[in-house]
Amino acid sequence: MTGSDAGYSAYYVSTGSVGLTDGDYVGVTSYSTTVGSYTEGTQGYQMSDTDGIMMMNTSTVSAVDSVSLDLFVQSTSWETSDYITVSFVGTTTTVLLDTNGYDIDLDFPTYEGAWTTVSGAVSGTGYLSVEFSSNAATESIYLDNIMFYSDGLDLDLDDDNDGYLDVNDDCPFDATEYLDTDGDGYCNIPVSYTHLT
């Protein structure tokens, strides 16, 4: 990713309910009555009363070491069927927050009614995914200030690309060798003897 802004895509998964057809709010908004103000600028991303599963995914970014976003969870009565999952999806998935199967009121009360920064260490190339499921008009979340961080170092853990990590490779710069079985500091180079005549 170059520049300072990442794009995003939104997806909806129907669970057999009325979905977003009953006047629900989803998307970029400047509506701030619930949140007071946004943490970065005058707009944020809102998901409310989805009556299904709503997902917002950022565009893919490279060489990421950590990620953060600001999350506002509306203070209301939540059920265990409502959930918020925040993940970084790359070669592997790093879950930063998962309320699935919990009651947000009881198990995540500090998230309600205030902006909370959700962050974590991640690695490599991937995208941030926020998944939200709720079934009441008072159940809303707001997202803002999504940030990807990188120290700028792209570590090459296998310098000779022979499939053995440098920490396990006695010959990290020789792709044809990886062992030094006698410990003399020289790789196990096959020796061929020829007779001199």
Name what the model sees in each region.
Residues 63, 73-81, 136-138:
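Extended, low-complexity, turn-rich repeat/linker tracts enriched in Gly/Pro/Ser/Thr and Asp/Glu
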Residues 67-75, 126-134:
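Extracellular beta-strand-rich recognition modules
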Residues 93-124:
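Extracellular carbohydrate recognition and processing domains
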Residues 133-150:
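Extracellular carbohydrate recognition
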Residues 152-196:
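Extracellular calcium-associated, cysteine-rich motifs in secreted modular proteins
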